[in-house]
Amino acid sequence: MRYPAMDFAFVLDPLPLLKAYKDSSVAMMRAVARRGHRVFAIEQPALYWRDGATRARAVPLTLHADDHDWYSAGAPEDRALKDFAAVMMRKDPPFDMEYVYSTYLLEAAEREGARVFNRPRAIRDYNEKFAIAAFRAFTAPTLVTRDAALIGAFIDEHGDAIVKPLDGMG
């Protein structure tokens, strides 16, 4: 059974910054396109709310297999987020105020009937790097701190460590 084509929106980083060969958002967009659906890219500055509706200047994409020239962009379309089959929040950190404001707009879109994946409140309230604290039985020795002395002592104790910012990519 063939279903009618649907429109999927992806809120993400600027397209030229995405590395198609390793970016999971690109893989998701390609999977959507392979199934005959339409893909739209939305950058954070393109999100807005007006007169009771969360909207965006959404850019339609044609996706290509070539990882270096992986998309062609059409002219931006002004669209209500609730009119998409799904809105995927795929923006990478930094977790700054623009990110927070984007989650507020996406939450408003949910209230208007949009289907937003990566729930705005959840990604705002639940830090992905600190989430491991809920699964202590499955983690290596872990330290979360901003204190350089504690980090040094932790490395001395364990020999090496992976150090990542809570609010950035890495």
Language-model segment annotations:
Residues 2-3, 7-34, 39-170:
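Active-site nucleotide/adenylate-binding loops and adjacent lid/helix of ATP-dependent enzymes
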